[in-house]
Amino acid sequence: VHLTAEEKAAVTALWGKVNVDEVGGEALGRLLVVYPWTQRFFDSFGDLSSPDAVMGNPKVKAHGKKVLNSFSEGLKNLDNLKGTFAKLSELHCDKLHVDPENFKLLGNVLVCVLAHHFGKEFTPQVQAAYQKVVAGVANALAHKYH
């Protein structure tokens, strides 16, 4: 991902304030509520029968935290996202058969959640930088797909 020095600074400054537990669970939960067909990859998570069930599901929260911890690794390696996410790309492609479009959806949901949490601090410039990052991460995760 090509970011200017200002964009990198904006992304890392905001990310330093992110509560990974909270934002991760909310982002994954929103993905599952807004795009219900994504739930088929999470059969083992138990009750996903309603928005309240999804948002309160401890497995959704735990996996959301895991997802954002991986995203954090990507932020430390913006110049090598494909390398950073190579194993995860392989897992999601070969074993889990996740539609790579879902990575884009989750990235966009994450941007919405960040905007919700940070309000005025999430300026259009910060959003533009994050859109570049989530697009780069989605692209890296889709890399192993044929």
From Swiss-Prot:
Transmembrane recorded as keyword: no
GO BP annotations listed: hydrogen peroxide catabolic process
SUPFAM superfamilies per UniProt: Globin-like
Modified residues (N6-acetyllysine): 59, 82, 144
Binding of heme b, residues: 63, 92
Top-rank lineage group of the source organism: Eukaryota
The Globin domain, residue ranges: 2-146
Record flagged with keyword Transport: yes
Keywords associated with the record: Acetylation, Heme, Iron, Metal-binding, Oxygen transport, Phosphoprotein, S-nitrosylation, Transport
One MF annotation (Gene Ontology) recorded for this entry: peroxidase activity
Subunit structure: Heterotetramer of two alpha chains and two beta chains.
Name by which UniProt lists this protein: Hemoglobin subunit beta
Species, as recorded: Mellivora capensis (Ratel)
